[in-house]
């Protein structure tokens, strides 16, 4: 980091003939200051420029007025020698004063240089924090994208679970319908069994009735034969041969047996077919129900795993949010600290600028005094060199001419140290 401090001082005074006398009135002409700082703390430059003009006539306490009054009152060479002696004494005192002021000026310049070296404006480099901030922002963005992707996966899993739930409900309804059909078929089987039992009961009753009728017929035949035998009569009846009741009963019995057998076979065949169909349907439905139960179990496991994943993702999201809040709070605190440091540095910089301006003003005042003394010394030296040829009236007549001495001091400061200093003095005539 480098600073360039430039101070420009200009002093105007009127000339007295061939000698220079300082003017005691002062009027600041211009004062300008500029500050430039590059990004990152490099290439910073502070430039201070001041220009002060002093102009005016000789006051009642000035040197020219004293000389004019002394010479006008005396008018003799003796008085001029006494005046020159007093001027020599004053010159010696002025030289001592100039030497002391130069010493004080060097001391002030050394203090200014030390102050600039110690409390030079410094700007810390925060560029390495920018990389960390960018990395954290990239991580936050990646975590946000991951959270969005996880939320999308959760939504897809929820939709898939809803589809499986609909399929499960459909299969459950089909299973209930099949179970209802099976229950109805079981009722039909029960009714058929009851009908079969009723028919078997009727067959048994018919068999008993047939046996009873056969027994009665045999008893009647035996009774008739006994009556015929006891009467001793031979009765010949020219009549057709009577039918054999036993044969008829046997035929009837055979017919009933055949009918019962056919009915039994038909019923057995029908109910066997119905039972086979029902068994096939039940087997098919049982297989479908088993598959549906297997699918339901898998869906339940999938839902449980998805719920576990959802809980883990929620926990991960909560932890990431907590981490994000902690990072934001930590970096907010660091930013506050950095802002505080920046404000402190700006305050120190403002104080340094104010101190520099104050010291520059003091230096300017001392420089003005030095210029005045140098002008008076030049005047005294000219008086001593000219001797009796000095004409105060000519000096007063030429007092309208004015010269400006402009002194520019440029200092280059790198990392709080003065690496170069240049002084430039210009004399401008008006």
Curated annotation (Swiss-Prot):
Q: Where are the Phosphoserine residues found in this chain? A: 7, 10, 15, 18, 30-31, 34, 42, 49, 51, 53, 60, 93, 100, 177, 305, 319, 323, 398-399, 401
Q: Which GO terms describe its biological process?
A: anatomical structure morphogenesis; extrinsic apoptotic signaling pathway; Golgi to plasma membrane protein transport; hepatocyte apoptotic process; intermediate filament cytoskeleton organization; negative regulation of apoptotic process; tumor necrosis factor-mediated signaling pathway
Please give the tissue specificity annotation from the record for this chain: Expressed in colon, placenta, liver and very weakly in exocervix. Increased expression observed in lymph nodes of breast carcinoma.
Q: What induces it?
A: By IL6/interleukin-6.
For the modification N-acetylserine, the affected residues are 2
Which portions of the sequence form the region Coil 2? 249-387
Q: Which residues form the signal peptide?
A: none
Q: Where is this region: Coil 1A?
A: 80-115
What modifications does the entry list under PTM / processing?
Phosphorylation at Ser-34 increases during mitosis. Hyperphosphorylated at Ser-53 in diseased cirrhosis liver. Phosphorylation increases by IL-6. Proteolytically cleaved by caspases during epithelial cell apoptosis. Cleavage occurs at Asp-238 by either caspase-3, caspase-6 or caspase-7.
Q: How does it assemble?
A: Heterotetramer of two type I and two type II keratins. KRT18 associates with KRT8. Interacts with PLEC isoform 1C, when in a heterodimer with KRT8. Interacts with the thrombin-antithrombin complex. Interacts with PNN and mutated CFTR. Interacts with YWHAE, YWHAH and YWHAZ only when phosphorylated. Interacts with DNAJB6, TCHP and TRADD. Interacts with FAM83H. Interacts with EPPK1. Interacts with PKP1 and PKP2. (Microbial infection) Interacts with hepatitis C virus/HCV core protein.
Q: What is this protein called?
A: Keratin, type I cytoskeletal 18
According to its UniProt entry, this protein's organism is Homo sapiens
């Amino acid at each position: 980091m480098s600073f360039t401090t430039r101070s420009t001082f200009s002093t105007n005074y009127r000339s007295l003939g061939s000698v220079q006398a300082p003017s005691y009135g002062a009027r600041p002409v211009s004062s300008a200051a500029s500050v430039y700082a590059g990004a990152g703390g490099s290439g910073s430059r502070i430039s201070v420029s001041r220009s002060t003009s002093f102009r005016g006539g000789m006051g009642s306490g000035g040197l020219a007025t004293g000389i004019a009054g002394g010479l006008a009152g005396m008018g003799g060479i003796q008085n001029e020698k006494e005046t020159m002696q007093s001027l020599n004494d004053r010159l010696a005192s002025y030289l001592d004063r100039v030497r002391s002021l130069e010493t004080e000026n060097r001391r002030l310049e050394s203090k200014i240089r030390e102050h600039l070296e110690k409390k030079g404006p410094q700007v810390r480099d925060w560029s390495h924090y920018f990389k960390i901030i960018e990395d954290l922002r990239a991580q936050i963005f990646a975590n946000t994208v991951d959270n969005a992707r996880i939320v999308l996966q959760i939504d897809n899993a929820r939709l898939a679970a809803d589809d499986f739930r609909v399929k499960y409900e459909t299969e459950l309804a089909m299973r209930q319908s099949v179970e209802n059909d099976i229950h109805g078929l079981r009722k039909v089987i029960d009714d058929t069994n009851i009908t079969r039992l009723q028919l078997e009961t009727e067959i048994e009753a018919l068999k008993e009735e047939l046996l009873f009728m056969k027994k009665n017929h045999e008893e009647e035949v035996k009774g008739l034969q006994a009556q015929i035998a006891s009467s001793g009569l031979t009765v010949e009846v020219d009549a057709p041969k009577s039918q054999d009741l036993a044969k008829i009963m046997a035929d009837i019995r055979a017919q009933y047996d055949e009918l019962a057998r056919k009915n039994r076979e038909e019923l057995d065949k029908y109910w066997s077919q119905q039972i086979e169909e029902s068994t096939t349907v039940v087997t098919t439905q049982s297989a479908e129900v088993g598959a549906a139960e297997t699918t339901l179990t898998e869906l339940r496991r999938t839902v449980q795993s998805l719920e576990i994943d959802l809980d883990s993702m929620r926990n991960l999201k909560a932890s990431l949010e907590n981490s994000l809040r902690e990072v934001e709070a930590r970096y907010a605190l660091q930013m506050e600290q950095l802002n505080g440091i920046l404000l402190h540095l700006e305050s120190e910089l403002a104080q340094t600028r104010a101190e520099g301006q104050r010291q520059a003003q003091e230096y300017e005042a001392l420089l003005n005094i030095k210029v005045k003394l140098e002008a008076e010394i030049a005047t005294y030296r000219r008086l001593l060199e000219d001797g009796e040829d000095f004409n105060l009236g000519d000096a007063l007549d030429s007092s309208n001419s004015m010269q400006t001495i402009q002194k520019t001091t440029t200092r280059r400061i790198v990392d709080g140290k003065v690496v170069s200093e240049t002084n430039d003095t210009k004399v401008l005539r008006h």
